[in-house]
């Protein structure tokens, strides 16, 4: 509540309109905290712009690719703000706003969301190199794989990883698809080394299925 005390009413109303639009178009449950966090973010972004400060979004490309619907909500937000307030927000800011919707959707922090986005990109690069393939980013298989990686990252940060319950099927996968299974084990090693998380044999098996 204290955060909102010094924020202009117009900024609060515009943020509320943006969230209402996003709820309708994303068709997901959003954590109620977004009303405070996004209002604070937008107010601060307006202040920064008034001072001539522009922030580059280092993850903009990844956000547009992995969280495209949330990015479109961010784009709607900057278009509305630019129209109503005369600001000149770029798509960098649309990306930052998109992350707030990702946080509210997956119930994570902004730092976790940055880390999860980097992790997904790192895994995709690893698979491309190990399997010597190029992804068709328009394909349903690619979309399903990215969706699986998003939920894997979410489970990792929530400490809700799958337990080893499909041991026999995992062995079958390892024997039938040794290359894909080996690649999945390398993904597990990458996650442990870079993010300190250990994933189960069942998680490795599901990665192999998608690969």
Give residue ranges: language-model regions.
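A cross-family "folded-core" feature that marks the main globular domain of proteins
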Residues: 1-211
């Amino acid at each position: 509540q204290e955060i909102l005390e010094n924020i202009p009413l117009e900024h609060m109303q515009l943020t509320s309109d943006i969230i209402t639009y996003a709820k309708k178009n994303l068709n997901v449950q959003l954590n109620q905290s977004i009303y405070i966090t996004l209002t604070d973010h937008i107010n601060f972004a307006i202040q920064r712009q008034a001072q001539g400060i522009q922030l580059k979004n280092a993850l903009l490309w990844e956000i547009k690719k992995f969280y495209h619907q949330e990015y479109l909500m961010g784009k709607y937000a900057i278009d509305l703000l630019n129209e109503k307030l005369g600001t000149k927000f770029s798509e960098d800011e649309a990306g930052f706003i998109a992350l707030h919707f990702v946080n509210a959707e997956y119930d994570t922090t902004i730092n976790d969301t940055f880390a999860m986005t980097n992790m997904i990109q790192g895994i995709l690069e690893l698979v491309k190199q190990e399997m010597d393939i190029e992804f068709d980013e328009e394909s349903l298989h690619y979309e399903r794989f990215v969706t699986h990686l998003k939920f894997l990252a979410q489970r990792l940060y929530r400490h809700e990883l799958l337990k080893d319950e499909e041991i026999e099927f995992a062995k079958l996968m390892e024997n039938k698809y040794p290359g894909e299974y080996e690649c999945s084990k390398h993904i597990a090693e990458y996650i442990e080394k870079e993010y300190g998380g250990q994933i189960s044999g069942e998680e490795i098996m599901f990665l192999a299925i998608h690969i």
